[in-house]
Amino acid sequence: MTRIFTFPALTTALTLALAAAALADDEYNVSNSLTLTGQPLGMHGVDPVSMFEAEKPEMGNATFTSAHDGVDYYFASQAAQATFEADPTAHLPQFGGFCAFGVYVGKKLDGDVRYADIVDDKLYLFVNEEIFKKYLEDKETVIHGAHAKWADIHHTPVSSL
């Protein structure tokens, strides 16, 4: 009897874990590889706190990992991890880490930390230098339009856009 109970329990747990990862993949810009905890990796392993507090983005370390909404984030230090854990949403990029300009035009494109802007204490990422320059021409319109569009595409799979 124990084996019969254990197998369905393990199957259910695995199904739920995979469903959470699949959901995160559609709503967050995550790396395909899984972390040591089995969850997808956010911001390509870059420390989200460093985007606000360091001179340049810093790569995180798996030693300092924190999960938020089914996604793991790496941090450069224990202090950065603690800062994040005190208020995760204050340090995460808008639109799940997808390119803000992409969201503005109804797409979920990769967000690259090399092309980032912080406006009103909110982090916005962009897919490349050309798109970032286009955004700089009319920041307010792009940000406002992206926030309006996000409600429509937030739960839409990337492959459907």
Give a label for each model feature:
Residues M1-L10:
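Bacterial N-terminal signal peptides that target proteins for export
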Residues T2, L23-D69, T89-L161:
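Intrinsically disordered, low-complexity terminal tails and linkers in eukaryotic proteins, enriched
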Residues A19-A21:
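N-terminal signal peptide c-region/cleavage motif recognized by signal peptidases
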Residues Y74-F75, Q81-E85:
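Mature extracytoplasmic domains of secretory-pathway proteins
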Residues Q78-A79, E130:
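Cytosolic histidine kinase catalytic core of two-component systems
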